[in-house]
């Protein structure tokens, strides 16, 4: 059997048939040309066994990023596993908005619920004069985030904290992509997310609004006079999250921002 025949057979029922190629190429460090050349060769019994195992894991909805052990975020390569969420493209938009609106040197930044460290590491790399701290309730997530910071040569500090419970500083920018999915919304989620990604980073009480409320309650005492808050939100939560923060920050403008698909996806408080 040729490689191309094996790949066609084993990827036929996958939602994204290119996932099999993605995983194999990354596990074996093959570029596109090497992969195409491989397709014309005969597949060995051992290779077929390994390829079948990868296909099986993909058919069980295991995210390809978890199989290869990393994910891309902006220009970063981040280690990921079941301790953290896989970074999403919409979070890149949140980072880009922060960078576009803030160019001043020596700002103090806090990323709440950092997970893999995607937001904090991106900001620390893009603005070397910023002082960036990142917190998470999960010790396991912080361990992985610290590894990612070292891999990507980013200088930042990590703190284990439930939102701002153990934070004492004030910040010029507080950013968060918190858990925001309601427990009764699992029907809208992909099986791969439900089965493999950590519940702690996905779900929140009060129809997904509980962490936003806690951030609003606590950030009042941790924001500088001209400080700003940036948040990622669920696409149905814009008005609810806006109301939570407008109640706490009556002297600031709380705005809803859309992603590239026109869906409510971000909140700014400034």
Swiss-Prot record:
Its EC number is 2.1.1.297. The keyword Heme does not apply. It is an enzyme of class 2 (transferase). This is Release factor glutamine methyltransferase. Substrate binds at residues 177-180. It comes from Lactococcus lactis subsp. lactis (strain IL1403). InterPro entries: DNA_methylase_N6_adenine_CS (IPR002052), HemK-like (IPR004556), N5-glutamine_MTase (IPR050320), PrmC_N (IPR040758), RF_methyltr_PrmC (IPR019874), SAM-dependent_MTases_sf (IPR029063), Small_mtfrase_dom (IPR007848). Gene3D superfamilies: DNA helicase RuvA subunit, C-terminal domain (1.10.8.10), Vaccinia Virus protein VP39 (3.40.50.150). GO terms for biological process: methylation. It catalyses: L-glutaminyl-[peptide chain release factor] + S-adenosyl-L-methionine = N(5)-methyl-L-glutaminyl-[peptide chain release factor] + S-adenosyl-L-homocysteine + H(+). It holds the Pfam family MTS. Keywords: Methyltransferase, S-adenosyl-L-methionine, Transferase. The gene is prmC. Methylates the class 1 translation termination release factors RF1/PrfA and RF2/PrfB on the glutamine residue of the universally conserved GGQ motif. Belongs to the protein N5-glutamine methyltransferase family. PrmC subfamily. The keyword Transferase applies. S-adenosyl-L-methionine binds at residues 113-117, 136, 177. GO terms for molecular function: nucleic acid binding; protein-(glutamine-N5) methyltransferase activity; protein-glutamine N-methyltransferase activity.
């Amino acid at each position: 059997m040729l490689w191309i025949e094996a790949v066609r057979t084993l990827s036929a029922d996958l939602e994204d048939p290119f996932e099999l190629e993605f995983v194999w190429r990354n596990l074996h460090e093959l570029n596109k040309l090497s992969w195409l050349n491989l397709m014309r060769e005969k597949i060995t019994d051992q290779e077929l066994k390994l390829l079948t195992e990868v296909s099986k894991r993909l058919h069980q909805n295991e995210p390809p990023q978890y199989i290869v052990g990393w994910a891309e975020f902006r220009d970063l390569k981040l280690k990921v596993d079941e301790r953290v969420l896989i970074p999403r493209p919409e979070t890149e938009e949140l980072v880009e908005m922060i960078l576009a609106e803030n160019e001043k040197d020596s700002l103090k930044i806090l990323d709440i619920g950092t997970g893999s460290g995607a937001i904090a590491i991106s900001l620390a790399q893009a603005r070397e004069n910023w002082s960036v701290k990142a917190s998470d309730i999960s010790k396991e997530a912080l361990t992985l985030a610290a590894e990612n910071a070292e891999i990507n040569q980013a200088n930042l500090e990590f703190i284990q904290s439930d939102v701002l419970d153990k934070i004492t500083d004030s910040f010029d920018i507080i950013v968060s992509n918190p858990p925001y999915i309601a427990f009764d919304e699992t029907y809208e989620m992909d099986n791969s997310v439900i089965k493999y990604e950590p519940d702690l980073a996905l779900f929140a009480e009060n129809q997904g609004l509980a962490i936003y409320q806690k951030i609003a309650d606590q950030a009042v005492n941790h924001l500088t006079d001209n400080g700003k808050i940036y948040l990622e939100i669920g696409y149905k939560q814009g008005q609810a999250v806006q109301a939570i923060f407008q109640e706490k920050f009556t002297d600031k403008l709380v705005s809803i921002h859309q992603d590239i698909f026109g869906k409510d996806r971000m909140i700014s408080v400034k």
